[in-house]
Amino acid sequence: SLLKRDYLLHSSGLIISGQASPALDLLLNQLPSTPGNLPVLQSHMNTYNGLYSLYFEKVHIACAAAAPEDVRSLVPGLSLTALLFCQYPMGFYVKKGNPRNIHDFPDLTRADIIFANREKGSSRRVLLDRTLKSSGISPESISGYRNELVSDYSTAAAVAGGQADVALGDSYAVRSFPELTFLPLTQETLYLIMHSENLDTPGFQAVTETISSENFRRTLALQTGYDTTHTGEIFSI
């Protein structure tokens, strides 16, 4: 609740925004074991909503897959620090063997293809819309563009269940659907964005120390296949 959020904003605990993510799940599971049993609350929201909430001081940390220049425009006038969380491939979910022969974004406009889309504000939707605009592709030419789902698992399930032919997401979700194939297209970087003035407080130190630890990086890579080469790197935005 908002009351709970406001309470935590003035406590030693942390509110971290973010959607379902194996990386965030691992972090949240490890933080309570840090000294002091740091209380942590996850606020489930997508990248853009999380950054807006950081701007309006409703969360302490935004887990966001957004380029630094996007963060600066969404959270203007503030001194922010980004902690690189992990990197992972983004691509299409299709049926095993790719029977529809889908390979790139222009294929989404074909009359025989139904797309399972994500909601506005999610990094998947941002990637899609930017690519469509730069390629001169009208969203209205894509069957299913207006049908929004709210997670990689839900879009992958739509493809697996035959409600759609293709969806856009990261590689991890496909592990739960043996009937699907993942077609990599690009790489996405996930960050933890926070106010720079909070970096030296115990809660934020616990986050940075946990993510930077060799144990966390190794476990995350083994469990997800994500690239943790630069995990724990910190820079100002």
Residue positions per predicted region:
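Hydrophobic/proline-rich hinge and linker segments of small-molecule sensing/allosteric domains
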Residues: T81-N117, L190-S196
